[in-house]
Amino acid sequence: MTGRETMKTIMEAKDISNADLAHSLGISLAAAWDRVNSVKLKDISSSILAQTLGAMGYKLVAIPVEADIPKSAFIID
């Protein structure tokens, strides 16, 4: 799953709209839409992804490959 796919999945599960996300991040609706839907780039930078996930109650972490993954976690490839 890509970073953008992860964001969309979380937004759907938590019923977060682009407007809600924009408000939480203090950015314009257009900027929020671009983070979630932009096709200009293959994926989103880790710093922007971490900021966006934080606004949705998640965080971006690096863990050892052999570590157990919690059920509520997402693996970003």
Pin down the residues of each PLM region.
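A short, Lys/Arg-rich alpha-helix, primarily the initiator
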Residues: 1-16, 24
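Short, charged recognition helix plus adjacent turn
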Residues: 34, 54, 61-77
